[in-house]
């Protein structure tokens, strides 16, 4: 019987094999997704030149089992590779210090204004709403930073990510990286994308309905009705999951994760300690304290959740054969959906309304997504690929109708045991 670590090596990159699972900062889950597959394209789009240089210095290994041949590159895949090279050459992957200075200052300003209105003018409800908006916008900013879009030095990205993610948000950046990078590597692929594993209470595929317990199926029958309530509560769930994940870091096989344990724990402890002290010293009553706490958390959670769910969840979930047949770039286009560009939409969605472009190149700075989207749309037209781009309210309708499909399926499913 192979140990988990043995099962997770080697990884095939550019016709060579490497053992990276024991130190990979992006997590072991993404490595697991590419066992027995060529990971070249996924590696290329999720790393900068620094990682390529490090890879060249690593010893190559001889795998103990036969690896598949390097994945064939079709015309569409080749065109997207060429476009990436053009974008690099024209500086589109270079972050604007001015833009990110503006984004950091305005995002912090939302939180400062919220606290100021509560402390100075006792405007508790308005202040709590602003604080919730701060949490939402800080979520997108942390997302940019943890994808290494913001700073050229990855150590600065990691440090600021800890401050903004753990300290100001209460989210573990290591927990986020582990799940989010796996999601990027295998979007909407059942058994590989952790984002679509939401049982209970949400079913996103026929397989989910089949696997659900009889009690879960009863619940799923109404999922399109309670979905928005779940969005409101998700920040609480995520924060709780982050605490559990950070507690487990010190026992992980991945040495990078073990090295992050103390930093992550200090960041989360600081977030909740400062929040508790604010409520203790600046809230006039327990009721006001509860109002501020729940309004800010619910607004922040809903603002993040509704964006995240809209961009790829209402699209068909696929298995390994379809995933392998698409190739990386084409697969991302088939399994992601944009939301129509616009000033308000771009701000509220934090650039994730350009989900197609972001999934093609996760390290592309947010402020360049709009310009690049026109080029991607043209390539999609050239290769007869879908470029979904509904308005925000249309995207929500698509999402709710998709949930309703599996709600009806759960209603018709025999009341036997889950498979």
From Swiss-Prot:
- Short sequence motif named Histidine box-2, residue ranges: 180-184
Any one annotated GO CC term: membrane
Q: Which gene encodes it?
A: efd1
Q: Which reaction does it catalyse?
A: an (11Z,14Z)-icosadienoyl-containing glycerolipid + 2 Fe(II)-[cytochrome b5] + O2 + 2 H(+) = an (8Z,11Z,14Z)-icosatrienoyl-containing glycerolipid + 2 Fe(III)-[cytochrome b5] + 2 H2O; an (11Z,14Z,17Z)-icosatrienoyl-containing glycerolipid + 2 Fe(II)-[cytochrome b5] + O2 + 2 H(+) = an (8Z,11Z,14Z,17Z)-eicosatetraenoyl-containing glycerolipid + 2 Fe(III)-[cytochrome b5] + 2 H2O; an (11Z)-eicosenoyl-containing glycerolipid + 2 Fe(II)-[cytochrome b5] + O2 + 2 H(+) = a (8Z,11Z)-eicosadienoyl-containing glycerolipid + 2 Fe(III)-[cytochrome b5] + 2 H2O
Describe the family membership recorded for this protein in Swiss-Prot or TrEMBL: Belongs to the fatty acid desaturase type 1 family.
Going by the UniProt record, its keywords in alphabetical order are:
Electron transport, Heme, Iron, Lipid metabolism, Membrane, Metal-binding, Oxidoreductase, Sphingolipid metabolism, Transmembrane, Transmembrane helix, Transport
What residues bind heme, as annotated?
24, 47
Short sequence motif named Histidine box-3, residue ranges: 355-359
Highest taxon of source: Eukaryota
Query: Pfam families attached here?
Result: Cyt-b5 (PF00173), FA_desaturase (PF00487)
What molecular functions are annotated in GO for this chain?
A: acyl-lipid (11-3)-desaturase activity; metal ion binding
Cite the EC number. 1.14.19.4
- Its annotated pathway? Lipid metabolism; fatty acid metabolism
- Additional comments on file? Euglena gracilis exhibits the metabolic behavior of a plant in the light and of an animal in the dark. Grown in the dark, this organism contains large amounts of 20-carbon chain length (C20) polyunsaturated fatty acids (PUFA), including arachidonic acid (C20:4n-6), and little or no C18 PUFAs (such as linolenic acid, C18:3). On the other hand, when grown under photoauxotrophic conditions, this organism is rich in linolenic acid and contain relatively small amounts of the C20 PUFAs.
CDD domains attached here? Answer: Delta6-FADS-like
* The record's note on its domains: The histidine box domains may contain the active site and/or be involved in metal ion binding.
Q: Where is the Cytochrome b5 heme-binding domain?
A: 1-64
From what organism does this protein derive?
Euglena gracilis
The record lists the membrane-crossing segments as 110-130, 156-176, 226-246, 266-286, 290-310
Full protein name: Delta(8)-fatty-acid desaturase
Cellular localisation: Membrane
- Which biological process annotations from GO are given for this protein? fatty acid metabolic process; sphingolipid metabolic process
Function according to Swiss-Prot or TrEMBL: Delta(8)-fatty-acid desaturase which introduces a double bond at the 8-position in 20-carbon chain length fatty acids (C20) that have an existing delta-11 unsaturation (double bond). Whether it acts on CoA-linked substrates (as in animals) or phospholipid-linked substrates (as in plants and fungi) is still not clear.
Provide the top EC class.
oxidoreductase
Where is the motif Histidine box-1 annotated in this sequence? 143-147
Task: State its cofactor.
Answer: Fe cation
| Membrane-topology descriptor | Multi-pass membrane protein
């Amino acid at each position: 019987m192979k140990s988990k670590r043995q099962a997770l090596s080697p990884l095939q990159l550019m016709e060579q094999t490497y053992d990276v699972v024991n130190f990979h900062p992006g997590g072991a889950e993404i490595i697991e997704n590419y066992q027995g597959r060529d990971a070249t394209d996924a590696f290329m789009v999720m790393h900068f030149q620094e990682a390529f240089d490090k890879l060249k210095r690593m010893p190559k290994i001889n795998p103990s089992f036969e690896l598949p041949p390097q994945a064939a590159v079709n015309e569409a895949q080749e065109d997207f590779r060429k476009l990436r090279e053009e974008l690099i050459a024209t500086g589109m992957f270079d972050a604007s210090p001015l833009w990110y200075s503006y984004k950091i200052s305005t995002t912090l300003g939302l939180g400062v204004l919220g606290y100021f209105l509560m402390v100075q003018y006792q405007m508790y409800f308005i202040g709590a709403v602003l604080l919730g908006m701060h949490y939402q916008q800080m979520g997108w900013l942390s997302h940019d930073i943890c994808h290494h879009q913001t700073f050229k030095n990855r150590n600065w990205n990691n440090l600021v990510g800890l401050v903004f993610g753990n300290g100001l948000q209460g989210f573990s950046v290591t927990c986020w990286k582990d799940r989010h990078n796996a999601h990027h590597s295998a979007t909407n692929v059942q058994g590989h994308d952790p984002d679509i594993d939401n049982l209970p209470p949400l079913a996103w595929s026929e397989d989910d309905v089949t696997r659900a317990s009889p009690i879960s199926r009863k619940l799923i029958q109404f999922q399109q009705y309670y979905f928005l309530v779940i969005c409101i509560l998700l920040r609480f769930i995520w924060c709780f999951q982050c605490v559990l994940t950070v507690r487990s870091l010190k026992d992980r096989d991945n040495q990078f994760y073990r090295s992050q344990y103390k930093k992550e724990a200090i960041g989360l402890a600081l977030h909740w300690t400062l929040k508790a002290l604010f409520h203790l010293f600046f809230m006039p009553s327990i009721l006001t304290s509860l109002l501020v706490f729940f309004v800010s958390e619910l607004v922040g959670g809903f603002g993040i959740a509704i964006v995240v769910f809209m961009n790829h969840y209402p699209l068909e979930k696929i298995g390994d054969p379809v995933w392998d047949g698409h190739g990386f770039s084409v697969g991302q286009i088939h399994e992601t959906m944009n939301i129509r560009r616009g000033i308000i939409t771009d701000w509220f969605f934090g650039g994730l309304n350009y989900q197609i472009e972001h999934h093609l190149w996760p390290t592309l700075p947010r402020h360049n997504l709009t310009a690049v989207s026109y080029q991607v749309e043209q390539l999609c037209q050239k290769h007869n690929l879908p470029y979904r781009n509904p308005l925000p309210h249309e995207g929500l309708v698509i999402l709710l109708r998709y949930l309703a499909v599996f709600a009806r399926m759960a209603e018709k499913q025999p009341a036997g045991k889950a498979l």
